[in-house]
């Protein structure tokens, strides 16, 4: 590949022929080493650590390696001590043929940071080849009229060794007619020539046999021989002459086999057999004989083997024309091989780092590779590129070496794998290209916090639940991978310091399931909220939180509680109802509450038992007890009512209230409590005498008082008295009870207190002033219960 002038190229393309790096990547100094060919594998050459001033630890840590220009592993680097060792036996003749000196160029590559150390290895020749002649017999036809001192060229020997190990001398067997003269040729080679010392006489001796010996300069020297047969001919006084001393021809390397290269023509003024010419090669190299052939009669030169500009750019072909009298003429053909674009670029990966972390800094080296094209000129100039829209870029480093580096930030959650196609195209016609695919994986770092599926969760739990009940779940996901995406859940400290969160709920750290630790009571706690956290297992760990609201659903676990009349087992209060009461007369109102909520606290009332069915009725929605019909003198005075209070839960719960009702003709007559039990026999005996005497003495007066009282009451019948009742305890209800009916007291009624003085045996009736004035103009319609 030939260097060329640099020119600007589009983004991501790199012209290979103008790469010249400065800075610390490449050291300008070139280290030179040498070794003799055919040495054993493992032979020590040098210690690069000492030569280049490096540390042994850098060899492994920075991935040190040896790279030759032709990518063959001639040497290897021992990472333990930095010794440069022979990796395979070297054959100088196979590597460099006749080129001297035989130098192999290589680089010592270090990564992170990227550094190149240029070096070269001189392969020294040893004397391992013997000089050989192409022909075992050399035929010379010499006219007997040849003048003394005439030179006769003879074939030279070939020795694959070079320098002093090549052919250094020729000798010929002793004879009276010839001596040997050596002529220096191209590339320091020596060519033998016979010099005529004594005239030949065909009649005396028509043929001579001589032994030619070739000796090299090795130690010990090697030699080879051939036999020269000299045939003495009649006199031929004109030698052949070529048209040109040198012919020059340009041949494309893609020329087909057997194609005509050139026709060389010579003339001879002699006639007859002395004028008949034959053409042949003269002192040509092995490559020439392998590649070309000459027609002995016409002098046409044909292509015998393929040409390859990348191996040999030109050939010098020495030809001769010999007439029938053994006189010869000489000429040369310079064949210049014309390069064609027949070699695509080559890509050799040196290193590849995969996977790379997604938080890699810009300019991080991902891959290092080298490229080359064996063509010349524009055919060997190359441009490299990768696909667009990738966060990578190609950058030149050292001669024919390039680095694939990061250009933009990476995000594994957006893309975790890149399939990169490196394309190298030459500038020949037609253009040839080579592609190499690499896969770069992006490894995860913990850069994403867990995210809950919802910012807040609302959970519903029915009260009286069993402990360890699963009440719901929270879920969070993490866009990272591996342990960075493994989420654990936890309860965060509540904002309310009085909320005993640790005793209410727990959370499964692995799946986010929430459990109630104990039975919840709606009447004690209707709702509470707390925060849950989700934390990944990355380093450092990232977390997020979400709000959880727990609403306790009411269950029908509270029976109605009767506030009035009191059901505490003490002396019952008795409701007084005048016999003159109209139908719908308000006797009293049963007041009850339910600790539940919603429909579980909707209360309904019904008359469960009555002394006289049909006389009283209970309003189902507000608990008012009213007369169902007009009272008569035939109705008994004492009545016992049992009112059932029932909620609307499922299943419903209930309570009962017992009422004592006394029918009176008027509120001026004394009140006698309903006896619950007969007086003891002892008390009856002690009072019998006194009662009989008192009854007899006052009976007349008593009857008169009764008649007078009845007359007065009849006059006042138009002003019926309102109901009397015992006082309802005043003050707030207990905090855990809720009056949902909205009627906590008797409405539009009088309040009475009728009590019996305990232990006196005498009845005392107290008439109290009304608390709320009675509205006589009340509507005849029943009061509607408040809506639920």
UniProtKB/Swiss-Prot annotation:
GO MF, one annotated term: calcium ion binding
Organism, scientific name: Pan troglodytes (Chimpanzee)
Subcellular location: Cell membrane
Record flagged with keyword Repeat: yes
Signal sequence, start to end: 1-28
Sites carrying sugar chains: 169, 419, 437, 568
Keyword Isomerase: no
A Pfam entry, by short name: Cadherin_2
Main localization (coarse): membrane
Name listed for the protein in its UniProt record: Protocadherin beta-18
Membrane topology value: Single-pass type I membrane protein
Chain ranges of the Cadherin domain: 29-133, 134-242, 243-347, 348-452, 453-562, 569-672
Biological process terms in GO annotation: cell adhesion; homophilic cell adhesion via plasma membrane adhesion molecules; nervous system development
Transmembrane feature ranges: 692-712
Residue intervals annotated with topology Extracellular: 29-691
Record-linked PROSITE patterns: CADHERIN_1, CADHERIN_2
Gene name as annotated: PCDHB18
Cytoplasmic side: 713-788
Keyword vocabulary terms for this entry: Calcium, Cell adhesion, Cell membrane, Glycoprotein, Membrane, Repeat, Signal, Transmembrane, Transmembrane helix
InterPro entries per record: Cadherin-like_dom, Cadherin-like_sf, Cadherin_C, Cadherin_CS, Cadherin_N, Protocadherin/Cadherin-CA
Primary role: Potential calcium-dependent cell-adhesion protein.
Cellular component annotations (GO), alphabetically ordered: plasma membrane
């Amino acid at each position: 590949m030939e260097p060329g002038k640099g020119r600007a190229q589009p983004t991501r393309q790199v012209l290979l022929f103008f790469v010249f790096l400065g800075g610390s990547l490449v050291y300008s100094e070139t280290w030179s080493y040498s070794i003799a060919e055919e040495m054993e594998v493992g032979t020590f050459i040098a210690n690069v650590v000492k030569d280049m001033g490096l540390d042994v630890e850098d060899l492994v840590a920075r991935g040190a390696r040896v790279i030759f220009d032709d990518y063959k592993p001639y040497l290897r680097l021992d990472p333990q001590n930095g010794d440069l060792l022979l990796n395979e036996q070297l054959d100088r003749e196979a590597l460099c043929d006749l080129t001297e000196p035989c130098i192999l160029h290589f680089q010592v590559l270090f990564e992170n940071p990227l550094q190149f150390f240029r070096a070269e290895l001189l392969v020294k020749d040893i004397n391992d080849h013997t000089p050989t002649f192409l022909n075992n017999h050399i035929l010379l036809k010499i006219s007997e009229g040849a003048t003394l001192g005439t030179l006769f060229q003879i074939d030279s020997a070939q020795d694959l060794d070079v320098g002093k190990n090549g052919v250094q001398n020729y000798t010929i067997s002793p004879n009276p007619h010839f001596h040997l003269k050596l002529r220096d040729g191209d590339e320091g080679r020596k060519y033998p020539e016979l010099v005529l010392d004594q005239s030949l006489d065909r009649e005396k001796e028509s043929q001579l046999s001589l032994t030619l010996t070739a000796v090299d300069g090795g130690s010990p020297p090697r030699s080879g021989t051939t036999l020269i047969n000299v045939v003495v001919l009649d006199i031929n006084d004109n030698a052949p002459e070529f048209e040109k001393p040198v012919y020059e021809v340009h041949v494309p390397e893609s020329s087909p086999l057997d194609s005509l290269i050139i026709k060389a023509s010579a003339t001879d003024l002699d006639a007859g057999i002395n004028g008949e010419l034959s053409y042949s090669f003269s002192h040509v190299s092995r490559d020439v004989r392998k590649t070309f052939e000459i027609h002995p009669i016409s002098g046409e030169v044909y292509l015998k083997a393929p040409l390859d500009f990348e191996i040999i750019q030109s050939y010098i072909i020495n030809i001769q024309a010999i007439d029938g009298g053994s006189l010869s003429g000489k000429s040369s053909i310079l064949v210049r091989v014309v390069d064609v674009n027949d070699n695509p670029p080559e890509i050799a990966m040196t290193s590849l780092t995969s996977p790379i972390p997604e938080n890699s800094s810009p300019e991080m080296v991902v891959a290092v590779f080298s490229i080359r094209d064996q063509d010349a000129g524009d055919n060997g100039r190359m441009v490299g590129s990768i696909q667009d829209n990738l966060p990578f870029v190609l950058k030149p480093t050292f001669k024919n070496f390039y680095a694939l580096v990061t250009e933009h930030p990476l995000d594994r959650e957006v893309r975790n794998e890149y399939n990169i196609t490196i394309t190298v195209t030459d500038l020949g016609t037609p253009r040839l290209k080579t592609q190499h695919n690499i896969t770069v994986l992006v490894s995860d770092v913990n850069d994403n916090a867990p995210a809950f599926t919802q910012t807040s969760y609302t959970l519903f739990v029915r009260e009286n639940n069993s402990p360890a009940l699963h009440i719901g779940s929270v879920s969070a996901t993490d866009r990272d991978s591996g342990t960075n995406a493994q989420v654990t859940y936890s309860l965060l400290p509540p904002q309310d310091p009085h909320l005993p969160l640790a005793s209410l709920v727990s959370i499964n750290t692995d799946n986010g399931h929430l459990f109630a630790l104990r039975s919840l009571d709606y009447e004690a706690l209707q709702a509470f909220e707390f925060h849950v956290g989700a934390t990944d297992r990355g380093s450092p760990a990232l977390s997020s939180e979400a709000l959880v609201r727990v609403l306790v659903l009411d269950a029908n676990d509270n029976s109605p509680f009767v506030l009035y009349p009191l059901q505490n087992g003490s002396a019952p209060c008795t409701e007084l109802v005048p016999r003159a009461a109209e139908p719908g007369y308000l006797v009293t109102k049963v007041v009850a509450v339910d600790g539940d909520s919603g429909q579980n606290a909707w209360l309904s009332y019904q008359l469960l038992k009555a002394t006289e069915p049909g006389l009283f009725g209970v309003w189902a929605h507000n608990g008012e007890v009213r007369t169902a019909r007009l009272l008569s003198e035939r109705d008994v005075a004492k009545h016992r009512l049992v009112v059932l209070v029932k909620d609307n839960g499922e299943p419903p719960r209930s309570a009962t209230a017992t009422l004592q009702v006394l029918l009176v003709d008027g509120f001026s007559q004394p009140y006698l409590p309903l006896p619950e039990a007969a007086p003891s026999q002892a008390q009856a005996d002690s009072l019998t005498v006194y009662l009989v005497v008192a009854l007899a003495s006052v009976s007349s007066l008593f009857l008169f008082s009764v008649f007078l009282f009845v007359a007065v009451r009849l006059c006042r019948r138009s002003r019926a008295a309102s109901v009397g009742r015992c006082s309802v305890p005043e003050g707030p209800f207990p905090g855990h009870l809720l009056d949902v009916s909205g009627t906590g007291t008797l409405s539009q009624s009088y309040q009475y207190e009728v009590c019996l003085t305990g232990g006196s045996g005498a009845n005392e009736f107290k008439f109290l002033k009304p608390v709320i004035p009675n509205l006589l103009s009340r509507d005849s319609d029943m009061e509607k219960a408040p809506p639920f």
